[in-house]
Amino acid sequence: MRMYPMKSPFLISNLYFGKGDPMPNRFKKSMKHLAAAVCLTLSCVMPCAAQEFLPVSEVQEGMHGYAKTVVHGTKIETFDVDVLGIMKGKGATGGDLVLVKVSGPLIDQTEGIAQGMSGSPVYIDGKLLGAVAYGFPQSGGRIGMVTPIGDMLKLWTIDDGKDTGLTPPSSKGLIPLTTPLMASGYTPEAMDFLAGKMQDFHMVPFASASASQDDVPQPLEPGSAVSATMVTGDLKLGAVGTVTYVDGDRMVAFGHPFMDRGNTDYFMHNSYIFTVIPSKNIPFKLGSVGAEIGTVNQDRGAGIGGMMGKLPHAVSLHASVTDEDTKKKEDLHVRMIPNEALLPTLSVTSVYHAISNAMDRKGQGTVDFTYTLYPEDMKQKPFTRSNMYWSSKDIAERSVDELYNVVRLLEQNRFEKYPLRSIMVDMHVTSERKTAQLLDASASPIIVSPGDTIYVRARLSPYRGEVFYKDLTFTVPKDQPYGDMILEVRGGGVVPLPYLIQQQKFNLTDEILDRIRTYKDFNDLHSRLMKEDQNNQVVVEILDPEVSMISKGENDGKKAEIQEKKAPENPDYLKNKDGLKEDGEKETHKSAVDTDYVIYGDGQFTFKVLPQAERDKALKKLAKSKQQATIEMSNKEKETLENKDKKTEGTDKDEKDSQKTSAMIAL
């Protein structure tokens, strides 16, 4: 028979503070809540008699008691508990669990033990035994297991100074594969996106709501509903369970781990329970995340522990999104827990909600955005990037991919910690397709020496727009070897076709390329991520000759042959641009110019790199041969025209236009 903990349902609610309400006001409101929580805690501590505990060694089969929990609003109610026996060594910390049977009108109403009841204190003869924490769905929800209070109180004395990130589910079969999430305030599109992202953490979101009294802090007592929250502010995301024991400003709850992170910085919130939702597997409480009242600083096998009146460390996020079509603007302010594993997901799901709410639609669009990550350590450099994306399917999802990847790479890098203080995002979105195809490009000179400047002109065609040109220069590296040098001209988000062919040839997936990529240190990682090409740039860079598609004699170096192809719909924008070699082996030499469009297409030039003396000699010879070719062509044209019959005016015009076109293509 499989045991399931009474996992605490996640709740998400959207608190409205008024249009344009700044973050400092929210912060002040949180501080007021915390101050009120301290006063409420102190006011109820004085008259309370010391609670007696019942050790497991004194527990006997057949003992009868009761448990406390909330199934509606904030009213604490009770249900009956009968001891069935002791299960040795079955606890998450290696301790014992007490097997119990629950009953009574409340249990009949909820159809058994429900998720969210985790932490419900169990009393026998007035003594606190522990917290209802696990259940057997196969028993109709009437059989559960209690975590002893002695194991839970140890949470107050543990401090290893470590945040362990996310711990995999216990091998003892006590933690289910999924945890229900409750959400309110999210657009339907944002809910779908949230569901996909939370699958990585074995959690499934459901719709919830907010309560009118959520802003009013309430004192905690055994049996109260409490939330361990990961996101607070305009949006709230948290796990709701039950308080087991309170001593002054300290409390323990849940009776099982939330995410088993060890030392934590969750926000502690009150919770209002709307109802208990029936389920085929196990029912769960549906509630809101209320006023912020403290910090949850421990998350371990025996439960969670925290302090009221203490503000946790957090990462703030401000997202400003403007829909250029409707001029609607969405401003979002949230605070998030500083967990390396969760922060990428918490960040992008919040930003996705902001862009989805601003657009009020789903589908194609172009987004232009800038974001900055500010580190907690002011001595470390902030990370700032701008980029542009187009999607024909879901521009909201497309626009947050880069932010997710960058936050993940920086937060989970192998060199050093990079804790963030805040994230700022500014987005402008439109339904207009702002893309351009790179038609061709010309370059001069085609014979160069190390250190020379090459002038490149790219011709681009916007989607349903007029052709335009972009000029840029490229400096030949001073250490460039003599011989052929191949330059790639491409859109900033396009992976050169030769590299894609090599990737397929050796069956190199994006995951493998990411593994073989190396960085010298954190500064190298930080710098190179910031300098990654932008999708709205025309980029010129040296292409590895080992993977070039240009064969000798196929290209005269005067014009790039452009491949008319788009980048993959969901490319990893951090692909290795240096071919199959490790990134750290050589510096990438490139030049780029910004445009107002997402650029597609790429092609290559071949240049001859020679010593200066040989270069000058070759250029003179080339100029002379071009001059001779021009003279010969002029004489031939003159002779042809003299021998021709007189043509009509229209025919003459067509021939002249044809000559002009040929001359232009030959340039």
What are these regions (language model features)?
Residues 49-667:
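Terminal presequence/propeptide segments associated with secretion/organelle targeting
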Residues 2, 14-22:
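Short, Lys/Arg-enriched N-terminal segments with co-localized hydrophobic residues
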Residues 21-35:
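Bacterial N-terminal signal peptides that target proteins for export
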Residues 6, 20-23, 654:
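Extreme N-termini of proteins with methionine-enriched Sec-type signal peptides or N-terminal signal-anchor
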Residues 32-34, 47, 648:
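Short, intrinsically disordered, low-complexity terminal segments
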Residues 10-12:
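Intrinsic disorder/low-complexity segments
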Residues 35-45:
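Bacterial N-terminal signal peptides
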